[in-house]
From Swiss-Prot:
Residues of the active site: C50 (nucleophile)
InterPro entries attached to this UniProt entry: 4pyrrol_synth_GluRdtase, 4pyrrol_synth_GluRdtase_dimer, 4pyrrol_synth_GluRdtase_N, GluRdtase_CS, GluRdtase_dimer_dom_sf, GluRdtase_N_sf, NAD(P)-bd_dom_sf, Shikm_DH/Glu-tRNA_Rdtase
Entry note about domains: Possesses an unusual extended V-shaped dimeric structure with each monomer consisting of three distinct domains arranged along a curved 'spinal' alpha-helix. The N-terminal catalytic domain specifically recognizes the glutamate moiety of the substrate. The second domain is the NADPH-binding domain, and the third C-terminal domain is responsible for dimerization.
Protein name (database record): Glutamyl-tRNA reductase
Pathway per the UniProt entry: Porphyrin-containing compound metabolism; protoporphyrin-IX biosynthesis; 5-aminolevulinate from L-glutamyl-tRNA(Glu): step 1/2
Stated role: Catalyzes the NADPH-dependent reduction of glutamyl-tRNA(Glu) to glutamate 1-semialdehyde (GSA).
Native species: Escherichia coli O139:H28 (strain E24377A / ETEC)
Residues annotated as binding NADP(+): G189, A190, G191, E192, T193, I194
Amino acid sequence: MTLLALGINHKTAPVSLRERVSFSPDKLDQALDSLLAQPMVQGGVVLSTCNRTELYLSVEEQDNLQEALIRWLCDYHNLNEEDLRKSLYWHQDNDAVSHLMRVASGLDSLVLGEPQILGQVKKAFADSQKGHMKASELERMFQKSFSVAKRVRTETDIGASAVSVAFAACTLARQIFESLSTVTVLLVGAGETIELVARHLREHKVQKMIIANRTRERAQILADEVGAEVIALSEIDERLREADIIISSTASPLPIIGKGMVERALKSRRNQPMLLVDIAVPRDVEPEVGKLANAYLYSVDDLQSIISHNLAQRKAAAVEAETIVAQETSEFMAWLRAQSASETIREYRSQAEHVRDELTAKALAALEQGGDAQAIMQDLAWKLTNRLIHAPTKSLQQAARDGDNERLNILRDSLGLE
């Protein structure tokens, strides 16, 4: 039995190839059935995200194994083998285990240490459980990777610092406000960055969100997802006073929120502080707003400096995480080798018990026919001894004929000889 990990990711393949190799959720069961129909495959998990498609397999060793699996992948997706080979990586046993642990821990992600990948790996594993997981070693490898990812999160700072603009904006808000559950957040725009911000805020229990956008339809889709209210851009002046936090990211060529607008809002709020995070380029908030008392304005450049600092911290934490992965990989491979020995021990014991039962049955039959008990017992002991030492004796003789002293010593040790 061999463990394999093969696939492509954002580092080895462009999006034009990644999208062709991906497995859609509605076709995943069919793909797993097709994969497990391959004679060498004992168990399989398919991990398919926007940044990677990987197959994790338990297989029987055979000639041309790599070629057979690449051919299956190309046939399934109607791909040119040469195109795929240029971008494909292939990891076996120790390297496959280490790779999965690194993936689950976010060490192989586009955004170093991002937590979402662990959920994606868990879902891929759960999907494989629906009648497709047939190899206990593969199942154990995934369960181990989940505990390793948890350990990396617990024992290092790999996920402690924001390294995306959206996440950094939310982290800044959490640092300034003791609890986000009691604040009102105004989001200006409804593009990808604001979508990410809104989801982060929802995860941190923000109860009231207002989304202001040029087109109501796009904003409404996001609002329905996160439980927000939608307003027009023209309503910002009137509603700004309600917001404790304003996060803005539009494509407007001119500022949307001016100094006068914020002054009026602060007056209505009786100078309760406002946090304004402007992550738009060009800027959505007039820079002069930052000069107002109780208005705390941060630009995308401010966030980038936070991100750069945090990325350096994550890289330092990644060194610690790699040490954990190496240690856990070594422990898993030791367990795997022990499993192999356990199977050999079971076979050896079963063989010995079969010999014992066979000879005991013959001895009992002889006793029932009135044979001499002492002679029957001596015959049983002699035959049992000969049958049990026959195979080890042949191995010792062959090692001696070959002049293989190392094998002789191993056999002596195995047989408990001084």
